[in-house]
Amino acid sequence: MIVGAGLSGLATAISCAASGHSVQVIEQAKELAEVGAGLQITPNASRLFRHWNLPASVWASAAEPTAMTVHRYTGEVLAHESNYDKNIRAKYAGAPFIDMHRVDLQQALYARARELDVAFHFDERVERIDCACHPATLTTRAGREYRGDLIVAADGLWSRCRECFVGRKDDPLPTGDLAYRIVLDAAQIEDPELRAWVEHPECHIWIGPGAHAVAYSLRGGKMLNIVLLVPDNLPPGVSRQPGSVEEMRALFAGWDPVYVQCSAVPGWTGWWLTMAG
């Protein structure tokens, strides 16, 4: 049994099912929602996508950066590598470095898990877990019981499984960092230089005082994902909230004019970065 149908839960389900195990996934959401932003998939992970025989949609929805550039926050180029896609494939036996939207990857993993006859139980919240008996028993808030030889806790930072295992509340620990994130459609981008970066996939990193930023293409050059990492300033008890254009302008004061172009749009969200204890 796997608790959680996020990326880690689905990946575990595929690996176990492909090895011949009978797998059930327990998920509290009523359905897989289209949430999240961009992900950067390194060659060790993209190699697994092939091993798992993920559907062609996972590759069609990806963007493979042809160049990697590191900028000083004022715009000066500190490092640049052309033919980044070819160099990575040559170095890692054909496995690519790709950028993609979390939703696209989750849907591809889910489709493959269904092909492998993984059973999914949605709208089920874990109430308690009994590991003393065999097989282990998981009881949901609705009173339904699920049994298995192994329970994998893949239910995220706010894991109910972890609380059941350690016998107490176990909140995630703050890292002191905050990530501002936004995904832009290419049609929203007016700056010609920035639009060229999106349509011809590249990855750009800006390093500044107390902060750094990353921008890269998604969906074959149709979208741009932007992340800005800064010190955490969210109110106590708040893990996510919308960011304002005014906040972005203050954070980007004196930064590369090209990056300022992509920061001055509505729709930013601040994410509190944490880790499990």
What are the functions of these language-model segments?
Residues G9, G20-S22, D117:
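Glycine-centered short loops/turns at secondary-structure junctions
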Residues A17-A37:
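Glycine-rich FAD pyrophosphate-binding loop
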Residues Q107-V265:
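Conserved FAD-binding catalytic core of PHBH/FMO-like flavoproteins
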Residues S8, E31, W158:
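Conserved Rossmann-like nucleotide-cofactor binding loop
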Residues M1-S8:
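Beta1/beta-strand and adjacent pyrophosphate-binding region of the FAD-binding site
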Residues A37-R112, L116:
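Active-site-adjacent segment of FAD-dependent monooxygenases/related oxidoreductases
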Residues L273-G277:
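FAD-binding beta-loop-beta segment adjacent to the flavin cofactor pocket
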